Amino acid sequence: MTGPARSGAAIRGAGRTVARGLIFLIQLYRHMVSPLRPATCRFVPTCSQYAVDALDEYGLIRGSWLAAARLAKCGPWHQGGWDPIPERPGCRVNCQDASDAWAVRATRGESGSLV
């Protein structure tokens, strides 16, 4: 691999590294600072979990944009509630298959179904 293809891969790799660094900083906040403050997030998942999920799923640029947009919604002017990261196009889950996944029998010492 040479030329533009190689530099594109290097940029994506650097973006992943920076995204992982941001996730680490968010996790530090979640485990060190957040427990010292009262729970005030009006969203599920919380804004910090949303940011981790967005960075993990979409990478540095789009994940940061999604996290910033979510933080901009955080305030008394928004009702909050369920607000997951958007699905990637073409990654829809079949609801029948998803409900069947909860009914799988536990094996080798794993926990059983929650439902």
From Swiss-Prot:
Keywords: Cell membrane, Membrane. The keyword Membrane applies. It is found in: Cell membrane. Disulfide bonds: none annotated. This is Putative membrane protein insertion efficiency factor. Pfam families: YidD. PANTHER family: MEMBRANE PROTEIN INSERTION EFFICIENCY FACTOR-RELATED (PTHR33383:SF1). Transmembrane segments: none annotated.
